Amino acid sequence: MLSMFMYNNIVDYVDDIDNGIVQDIEDEASNNVDHDYVYPLPENMVYRFDKSTNILDYLSTERDHVMMAVRYYMSKQRLDDLYRQLPTKTRSYIDIINIYCDKVSNDYNRDMNIIHDMASTESFTVYDINNEVNTMLMDNKGLGVRLATISFITELGRRCMNPVETIKMFTLLSHTICDDCFVDYITDISTPRDNATTNSSTREYLKLMGIAVIMFATYKTLKYMIG
């Protein structure tokens, strides 16, 4: 588990983000002549996933490129520092998730692209996405569906136009995905055992990934067809 010091730092960081959003909303409202306009709460803001959105479209001057480079460097240093502070067990779980989620993305790249394209045509709130994921996980207890969901949500996060809201989405969905089933699977995989047994079990789990992708696509297609 994270140390209390690290936990407090993370909580403070999230609180700073929340306070900044609230302050931005209040500042914007005070400068707006239409004081009856109600600004949406951050957690209810809509995610718009646009496949054509490219960060390069917003970088037009040398200053823009330099500022982006600085922001990237600072973000990377913060993440690298957090990784170094994590306990060995946490880092081992990160390695496991990296390996298997990369496998999902590679093996089911075409199917997942179809779903990404479908998601790009619609708008969601963070709760819409979380409810759909929660419903899917309740109906399927396999490891594959959870790994496929992580890959899918990660890809959606890359397409989200609002970085702060992306952080909020990842935070909420990490709680949803990390249910008892997922914790049991990951801890089981990380436990040293006979390689043949491990590989056999993993193959069975990974078979569910294709089913997970089809389930998600079918669910979303029916939802939008029915309205």
From Swiss-Prot:
It is found in: Host mitochondrion outer membrane; Host cytoplasm. InterPro entries: Bcl-2-like_sf, Orthopox_F1, Poxvirus_F1/C10. The keyword Signal does not apply. One of its GO terms (cellular component) is membrane. Induction: Expressed in the early phase of the viral replicative cycle. GO terms for biological process: regulation of apoptotic process; symbiont-mediated suppression of host apoptosis. It comes from the Viruses. Plays a role in evading host innate immune response by inhibiting host inflammasome activation. Interacts with and inhibits NLR-mediated interleukin-1 beta/IL1B production in infected cells. At the host mitochondria outer membrane, interacts with the BH3 domain of host BAK and prevents BAK from binding active BAX. In turn, host apoptosis is inhibited. This is Apoptosis regulator OPG045. It comes from Rabbitpox virus (strain Utrecht). The lineage of its organism: Viruses, Varidnaviria, Bamfordvirae, Nucleocytoviricota, Pokkesviricetes.
